[in-house]
Amino acid sequence: MEQVVIVDAIRTPMGRSKGGAFRHVRAEDLSAHLMRSLLSRNPSLEASAIDDIYWGCVQQTLEQGFNIARNAALLAEIPHSVPANTVNRLCGSSMQALHDAARMIMTGDAGVCLIGGVEHMGHVPMSHGVDFHPGLSRNVAKAAGMMGLTAEMLARLHGISREMQDQFAARSHARAWAATQSGAFKAEIIPTGGHDADGVLKSFNYDEVIRPETTVETLSTLKPAFDPVTGTVTAGTSSALSDGAAAMLLMSESRARELGLKPRARVRSMAVVGCDPSIMGYGPVPASKLALKKAGLSTSDIDVFEMNEAFAAQILPCIKDLGLMEQIDEKINLNGGAIALGHPLGCSGARISTTLINQMERKDAQFGLATMCIGLGQGIATVFERV
């Protein structure tokens, strides 16, 4: 079986969905920009040598519809002979794209794959056109389709207080802002064209979603967003709405050697699991455990974790049950997470994997794990190993 390596991993800045930098930029353009960038950064790879493109996207309608992977590839002037497929596992879409490509390479059905994902939540809202089958209520609580209420459920089940959530959210913004100021994101962000507040076209090389002024005190003034009577989850402790894309270049280790490209990391293991939709945010726990089992590792072997911050009330129970509460500041989301950067649904799996690989390089870490919860009760995880 072929070893799968990550040769490159990049992303756009995260733009604010409401009147943000990418309000006049389409999702296909964000995607095509990264596809072109990966090729220009790795000139020994001919675009025609790409065997397939896997691109995550959740709301596949309007500008994100009709196979956005193919539309973006055509915009990027990738040869018509290169196929492209749009992948949807809700929040885990672009990590699923990574898994699909990795399996193709492992089995020898592909040698080179370009993967990634995008979501323009400003142009295509998360709830656009969603129409749940009424019969689902026989098997699943209606509230299980409301992500904020599933976070409230986890908070109650695991004793996660409002103060704990506010502290974690403030940490996310503080860490993301510190990473921005120190240049820690520079290696992963590709400057991307957008418009400033006055409508002037400019190049953005920073995440505009981060709120550096965020403190526990300011967060404590916010009202519950989903359960106004007894709730503890607020907009401030939920992932921000943002627009963005992320992309990675995968290939077999032997193909990388042929092309003279230096692998940055190896895919060590992958896992996807299901869980009760009412606690969908708990999915990273069984997914991470399964990925670690497949890799022959334990949580203590992992040097760095990237766990998608759908909600503070969701990620804290996962950290607790993975036995990592005492290691948050040493191992988990060291540059902040989706509470500060946002969670463009189809982008996030590739985004956290990209951030993880860059973080592993900075810390000279051997193993890293990226994981995320998925709406309606799933979890997905990937273990990476530095090459």
Curated annotation (Swiss-Prot):
Active site, per annotation: C91, H343, C373
Molecular function as annotated in GO: acetyl-CoA C-acyltransferase activity
Enzyme class: transferase
Pathway: Lipid metabolism; fatty acid beta-oxidation
One BP term from GO: phenylacetate catabolic process
NCBIfam families in alphabetical order: AcCoA-C-Actrans, fadA, PRK08947.1
Protein name per its UniProtKB record: 3-ketoacyl-CoA thiolase
Species whose genome carries this gene: Klebsiella pneumoniae subsp. pneumoniae (strain ATCC 700721 / MGH 78578)
